[in-house]
Amino acid sequence: MAGRGKAIGAGAAKKATSRSSKGGLQFPVGRIARFLKAGKYAERVGAGAPVYLAAVLEYLAAEVLELAGNAARDNKKTRIVPRHIQLAVRNDEELTKLLGGATIASGGVMPNIHQHLLPKKAGSSKASHADDDDN
């Protein structure tokens, strides 16, 4: 029976490598593949689809976390809280468009004062009174 089965003295079985590590990702490709199959989004799921989706999700998470970290640092804090995520998302035009309908729990609101409620500037009000006196 030479040539069949495992050779005697052959090395141990090759160690399994995850699809996440093959793709250089931190997000779980296998779990995303399982969710895609269980979700019945399509009858079949290609091999590259969960890898691509994991890469996209990882990129978006990294982008939001980077901006939230900057917001936390601007507020002299070392821990990111939901308020920092809210500020990061709402100050970025593309993320606001993507997450416009999403509500971030404990995120608060964006600081905004309507222009009509702000006090009038002293220099501009004198100029407008001078124009009124000419008529």
Curated annotation (Swiss-Prot):
CDD domains: HFD_H2A
Coiled coil stretches, renumbered: none
First and last residue of the signal peptide: none
Protein's UniProt keywords contain Nucleus: yes
Keyword annotations of the record: Chromosome, DNA-binding, Nucleosome core, Nucleus
Location of the protein in the cell: Nucleus; Chromosome
Gene Ontology CC terms: nucleosome; nucleus
GO MF terms held by the record: DNA binding; protein heterodimerization activity; structural constituent of chromatin
Protein purpose: Core component of nucleosome. Nucleosomes wrap and compact DNA into chromatin, limiting DNA accessibility to the cellular machineries which require DNA as a template. Histones thereby play a central role in transcription regulation, DNA repair, DNA replication and chromosomal stability. DNA accessibility is regulated via a complex set of post-translational modifications of histones, also called histone code, and nucleosome remodeling.
The protein's assembly and partners: The nucleosome is a histone octamer containing two molecules each of H2A, H2B, H3 and H4 assembled in one H3-H4 heterotetramer and two H2A-H2B heterodimers. The octamer wraps approximately 147 bp of DNA.
Family under the similarity heading: Belongs to the histone H2A family.
Protein name: Probable histone H2A.8
Organism of derivation: Oryza sativa subsp. indica
Lineage, uppermost ranks: Eukaryota, Viridiplantae, Streptophyta, Embryophyta, Tracheophyta
